[in-house]
Design a protein with these regions (language model features):
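Conserved N-terminal diphosphate/IPP-binding helix and adjacent helical/loop segment
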Residues: 7, 12-133, 137, 141-156, ...
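All-alpha helical catalytic cores of prenyl diphosphate-utilizing isoprenoid enzymes
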Residues: 81, 96-100, 164-165, 182-281
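Alpha-helical phosphate/pyrophosphate-handling elements in metalloenzyme active cores
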Residues: 85-127, 177-178, 221-264, 300-302, ...
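A glycine/threonine-rich phosphate-anchoring loop and its flanking beta-alpha core
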Residues: 157-158, 168-184
Length: 383
């Protein structure tokens, strides 16, 4: 609804806007026609979305495609600074495996939404993408994961020592890029560097918590949320926060966008846990429910373990590292019947709603609508 007078600065519930526009303004309506006409508008009533699910994905992917090449060129230009050939190869390795570059492009999208998007946002996005890949290189060593993005992990393609060195160099290169950029003002640089440094620290803390969870008899839901807030969500939070800083947003807007990024990241990670249980082996590239045999303390597993329910197959397989996956569908069915899988989806939806409320505080523009599509994209991944 158009916001005038006393309503101009107010937050209007999305479900009321949908009802007002589509039902109250017209004397009669056809629900099928309403649904079929929703090409870009988000209509949310609880967990119901009367929006073609492919639209969020296509809008986000189109935006990523528009900006991706620019960010990719900045990344490659900076990697070319590395004169030692083997080190440069190790640092560049994961970038040859593709990826959507969501974190790399988010700065420009947020900049457009809250103020003034400019070239500095591309540099910032490239910086965070390189630092993100540094964390992946080190994570794969610590977890001894052999594959990343369909490629041999860096420590497999090269060796452990080179991979560690490459990760360290990527972290250093990210900060060097920021300092050298002519598009980032000196007054903003301090805040940006501080935020990214804090992000890296939170990622490390989250990773350490994840390690320690493996040897714990029990992990609470609050502890799990704290862990993924550091290991996963901190990067989304910092992407949004630093973009707002470079766009010249005020303190309240910066904090609001940081909150949006945090909840986007929490939704992203919980949906990953959900998808592992509900998708198929062909899509995942691994058996559905493999988190069970790996003993991962996901929100689904925590809910199941704390429920007191029998769940014999789940409890038998949990943490066994078994390569026999024949019983996994039975364990997944137990989790579904117990409500553990639905519980995780409900929590993801909760963070999805909070993220949208953050966007409700902004002037509603095409750039903000794209951030809404990015928020919905986290849920569209289940379709």
């Amino acid at each position: 609804m158009e916001r005038k007078g006393r309503w101009k600065s107010q937050i209007i519930a999305p479900w009321f806007e949908a009802i007002f526009h589509n039902f109250l303004l017209s004397g009669d309506f056809n629900i099928e026609e309403v649904v079929s006409n929703q090409k870009s508008e988000i209509i949310r009533c609880g967990t119901l979305s009367v929006k073609h699910p492919e639209n969020s994905a296509s809008n986000v992917l189109a935006a990523l495609g528009e900006h991706r090449d620019i960010v990719e060129e900045i990344i490659q230009q900076n990697l070319s600074k590395i004169q030692q050939e083997r080190l440069r190869g190790a640092m560049s390795h994961l970038f040859t495996g593709g990826g959507k570059r969501l974190r790399a492009i988010m700065p420009r999208l947020v900049g457009d939404a809250v103020g003034y998007g400019h070239e500095g946002h591309y540099t910032l996005g490239a910086c965070i993408e390189i630092i993100h890949n540094f964390t992946l290189v080190h994570d794969d060593i610590m977890d001894q994961d052999p594959i990343r993005r369909g490629l041999d992990a860096v420590h497999v393609a090269y060796d452990n020592a080179t991979a560690i060195n490459a990760g360290d160099a990527m972290l250093a290169l990210g900060f060097e890029m920021l300092a050298d950029s002519p598009h980032i003002q000196d007054g903003q640089l301090r805040d940006v560097v501080s935020a990214i440094g804090e992000m890296v620290r939170h990622v490390a803390e989250g990773q350490q918590e994840d390690f320690e969870f493996e040897d714990r008899v029990s992990v609470s839901e609050d502890e799990y949320i704290s862990m993924i807030a550091g290991k996963t969500s901190a990067m989304f939070e910092t992407c949004a926060e630093t973009r707002a800083i470079l766009a010249g947003a005020d303190t309240n807007a910066v904090a609001n966008m940081a909150d949006w990024g945090l909840n986007l990241g929490l939704c992203f990670q919980i949906m990953d846990d959900y998808i592992d249980m509900t998708s198929d082996t062909e899509t995942l590239g691994k058996p559905a429910g493999s988190d069970i045999v790996q003993g991962k303390r996901t929100l689904i597993a925590i809910h199941a373990l704390e429920s007191g329910a029998d769940l014999p197959t789940f409890r038998k397989l949990f943490g066994t590292e078994s390569t026999d996956t024949d019983e996994l569908p039975v364990a997944v069915k137990e989790l579904r019947n117990n409500g553990s899988i639905q519980y995780a989806l409900d929590r993801a939806m909760e963070h999805h709603r909070i993220a949208h409320r953050c966007l409700d505080k902004l002037e509603q523009t095409p750039a903000v609508n794209l951030l809404r599509d990015m928020t919905d994209f986290q849920l569209v991944r289940i379709n």
